Each structure stands twice: as C-alpha cells, then as structure tokens.
C-alpha cells in the first residue's frame, strides 16, 4: 500500500520535472533541487513523512528563505 501511495505522490513530481521545469529558468535556491529533494524524501521516508518533508522544503524555497546545501534528513 505504501509503495502505491509513494508512486502516486511521485507522479506529479516526475510530470513537473519532465514537462514544466524545462520551460522555466532554474530558480531553486537549494541543492538538491526541490523536486530532487521531494523524490528522495518520499523514497527514503515513505509517503507520509516524505510528503511532509517535501512540502516543508517547498514552502522554504522563496526569495527571503534560506539557500544552499539542504540534504534529506
């Protein structure tokens, strides 16, 4: 069940990386990028904690937020 939910959560990220991201300039302030972070967080921590970590990271990615190296815990 967790694998199915993880897969469903990763689909929009893969869609974004394949179709939307190539048409926009690079803007993520962090390394790894927010989409890479989301994929790694969901694969490493499962769908619930991974989604929480990914959303938290995306909310921090703005001009007045932090920047730099921020690995998945």
Curated annotation (Swiss-Prot):
GO CC terms in record: plasma membrane
Source organism, top-level taxon: Bacteria
Pfam families: YidD
Locations listed in the record: Cell inner membrane
InterPro entries noted in UniProt: Membr_insert_effic_factor_YidD
Keyword vocabulary terms for this entry: Cell inner membrane, Cell membrane, Membrane
Region forming the signal peptide: none
SMART domains: Haemolytic
Membrane topology according to the record: Peripheral membrane protein
Function summary: Could be involved in insertion of integral membrane proteins into the membrane.
Family designation: Belongs to the UPF0161 family.
Name of the protein in its database record: Putative membrane protein insertion efficiency factor
Naturally occurring in which organism (per UniProt): Phocaeicola vulgatus (strain ATCC 8482 / DSM 1447 / JCM 5826 / CCUG 4940 / NBRC 14291 / NCTC 11154) (Bacteroides vulgatus)
